[in-house]
Amino acid sequence: LTVGVVTKPFNFEGRRRMMQAEKGIEELRTRVDSLVIIPNERLKFATDQKITFANAFEIADDVLRQAVQSISDLIKNTGFINLDFADVTAVMQNAGMAHMGVGRAGGKNKAEDAAKMAISSPLLETSINGAKGVLVNVTGSMDIGLEEVEIAANLVQQAAHPDALIIFGAAFDDTLEDEIRVTVIATGFEEVEGAMPNKPFSAAAE
């Protein structure tokens, strides 16, 4: 299994650099099973941190690291309902463009908020709408409620294709305390007509 995770240049880097990146992405698509594309320009929608010229590229590199680590963690970390390499392969092998989102939230509506963040990641150009292959992993402390898990999983299922292969996993992490983390990897949505890039999702303050 070969998964590519790449960034596209900031707009200020110029049209020529963007064209070179687009050409490289098209070539890379023929050499990987799945490809996650993160446009640097969308970083401004995805963080409350002030983005300066000095730290812009550092933030972009950290986003890449988080994307790769999220996939790696699903494979290597043992969960209560475990996801493994075979599950990741089932969704990402020969799958083309991929959506990968992680949401983390606390408070009364934490399950809904975390799931929506994962589904509508402001960093990506892809959309989970109509996805035909989905991995969803819900992580919380030992006292996470069954209803909260159901809410998060159902929101992901509703966004995917009715006949999608959905593989569900769950894990415990007491360091999250009152928070829930939802990780979503989705593929098989390239044929969806009219799919639009995701808009940022903001959870209301509790």
Regions found by a protein language model. Give the residues of each.
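Tubulin/FtsZ superfamily GTPase core signature
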Residues: 1-206
